[in-house]
Every structure is written in structure tokens, then in C-alpha cells.
Amino acid sequence: MAALGDIQESPSVPSPVSLSSPGTPGTQHHEPQLHLHGHQHGSPGSSPKVLSQPSDLDLQDVEEVEIGRDTFWPDSEPKPEQAPRSPGSQAPDEGAGGALRSLLRSLPRRARCSAGFGPESSAERPAGQPPGAVPCAQPRGAWRVTLVQQAAAGPEGAPERAAELGVNFGRSRQGSARGAKPHRCEACGKSFKYNSLLLKHQRIHTGEKPYACHECGKRFRGWSGFIQHHRIHTGEKPYECGQCGRAFSHSSHFTQHLRIHNGEKPYKCGECGQAFSQSSNLVRHQRLHTGEKPYACSQCGKAFIWSSVLIEHQRIHTGEKPYECSDCGKAFRGRSHFFRHLRTHTGEKPFACGACGKAFGQSSQLIQHQRVHYRE
């Protein structure tokens, strides 16, 4: 693998960063280095891999990477897998940040450090250990990648990205408590675990949207939102279901889809106990209990619980009937009425009585039939 210093600067790189390791004595010439603790796929006696020279790396929204952690990306949104390429090749738009991401993904997730640091005496080496296999004194997971703002002016877009990357986001495990949120917004008091998340949140108050789509001009506060939007233009769908093969452009949509297969319904109503697979469905359901009707018709003032019902209602005023039967040509305002009509042609009767087994094409017919059993 080529050293990061050998990678040419990408035109899209907005802000130079440097790599450093905490707790390391000052190196000669103050060159920032990242020691990988021998976690490369090599022999125990191989020399430790050191990345040197502060190349201009574009790590996008990366705040911190700790060697040995289960998750390399602290951001809540997972990064899509890159298509495999031949060794030594590099995409034209992939800067040194892409090389670093590939490097980190190649490391074992829970490997323990056993890098050797030059010759040592037999007295310093534990019994039974071969030369070059003396364990590193630094605890596993304590090394980090630190983003440091550089004074030198970068290419176009650098001031925008520098605001997001221009802070030391790295931290060692010993340096902060698990679950701590030390970065607080002065405007609303909300706290965040990482300073980059605070910077992104503050754009809600300032209205700043530094990431602009070159296709349609739409702007975004965060880099991840911009990347997800860009897939609308490219058609990229990196998240594929292993059970049915359906692909999605957003990880959140993929997660919601998986609940169809596993039957998971994590969102439960506190009033009636009904559970839902999506939080939005729970919010809409709770309006049945609260009586809230946030969607009002601008023509007649009638209000509705759901926006879909409002859209269907507005077709009364416009006369629009978008659902047309291909068999008889009859058109309908709503989809539910359209599907109910189709059953008159297909003969489908999906509503069956639990008492006698008689089936009906419409739910209203089933309800009317069940009154016979109630009288009995």
C-alpha cells in the first residue's frame, strides 16, 4: 500500500489535515505520524507501519478514528461500501482521504497490538516471545486520527469545509467518559458528543448551508445529507436487501424495509399498545388519541389527521380522478376506492368472517354480515 504522502492532492480536497498520535513524545522535525501498531497483515516481527508527512486529506465528516474499535465511523450515518478496484488503482475523484478509509477498513477490528520497536534485550522481552514481538505499551484503541486546521489557504470550498474540520476532534478512550457530551450549543443548550456534530447543529440557528448540489442547486447543512441527495441524480443505491434484492439509496429506508422481513415493530403506542415498524406511523396513529388534525383544506377549512387524506379530499374541489380502471374506464379520486372497485372485476374477497368463514369483497360488507352473529 502506498504511503499517504505519495498520493497526489485532489482538486476537491477542501482543507489540509494532519495525522497524529496522543501521548507520543515530540518527533524529529515535528512531522505528524500515525503508528498502526503492527495491525497490518504482516508477520509479528515486521516493522511498524508509520504514516508520515501532513498530506492534504479529505476525511469528510470524520471526527475520530480509533484503531481497534468496532466502528470506525462515529457519525450515525453509515458510509456506503466502495466498489472493489484492482490493487494500486485509484479513482480520479478519490483523494488521500479515500486511501486512509481503505487503510482503516483493512485493519482487523479487534486486533491486539504486538508491534516491535527495534532491537531489545532478552531481559526486556517476556519469556517465550520471539524478537520483535514485544507488546506496545500504549493500550489498544488509544490511538486516534486528529484533524487539525492548517493556516495555508486551500482550494475552492476550503473555508466552508475548514469550519467543519478545523477542530481537534480526536480523543483517546482515557480522555473522555463513555456517553459524555461535552460540546454544548450556546443558542439552545443542546449537547453533542463530537464538536463536528455541534458545528453541524449550529447551522440550524445560522441558516448556513455550505454544501450545494451542482445538478439542481439545492443546498445542505451537512455533508452526509448532500451525499444522500446526490444519489437522486446518480441513481446509486448502495444498500441492498439480502432477502429480496431490493436496493435503497438511504440507509434509513433500508433499515425500515428490513422490518418487513423480520416483523420488528419497535415503536409502541403508550395509549393502546399498538406497535409500528416506523416512527412516522406511530406519530400519525397517536393523533387518533389526541384528536390533532394538523392538515387543513385551504378551500373549505376542513381538517384531517393525515396529509394523504387531505390530498384525496382536495380532489373534490379540483375534480381530479387519477386512478382509472383499465377494464371499464371508471375513474376514482382515492386509491382505496380504486382497489375496492377492481375486486368487482377480479372476484377477490379478502375479508373473511371469523365465525362462519364467509368472505366478502369489501370490509363494510363483512361488518354488516357480522351483525348476524352478534344477534345470535
From Swiss-Prot:
Cellular localisation: Nucleus
UniProt-annotated stretches for the region Disordered: 1-97, 113-135
Chain positions of all zinc fingers (C2H2-type): 183-205, 211-233, 239-261, 267-289, 295-317, 323-345, 351-373
Matches recorded under InterPro entries: Znf_C2H2_sf, Znf_C2H2_type
Example GO molecular function: zinc ion binding
Phosphoserine modification, residue list: 86
Residue ranges with Polar residues bias: 43-55
A Pfam family annotated for this UniProt entry: zf-C2H2
A Gene Ontology cellular-component term: nucleus
Keywords, comma-separated and alphabetical: DNA-binding, Metal-binding, Nucleus, Phosphoprotein, Repeat, Zinc, Zinc-finger
Highest taxon, organism lineage: Eukaryota
UniProt-listed GO biological process terms: regulation of DNA-templated transcription
Compositionally skewed regions (Low complexity) per UniProt: 10-27
Main localization, broad class: nucleus
Family membership noted in the UniProt record: Belongs to the krueppel C2H2-type zinc-finger protein family.
Classification via PANTHER family: ZINC FINGER AND SCAN DOMAIN-CONTAINING, ZINC FINGER PROTEIN 112-LIKE PROTEIN
Official protein name in the record: Zinc finger protein GLI4
Gene coding for it: GLI4
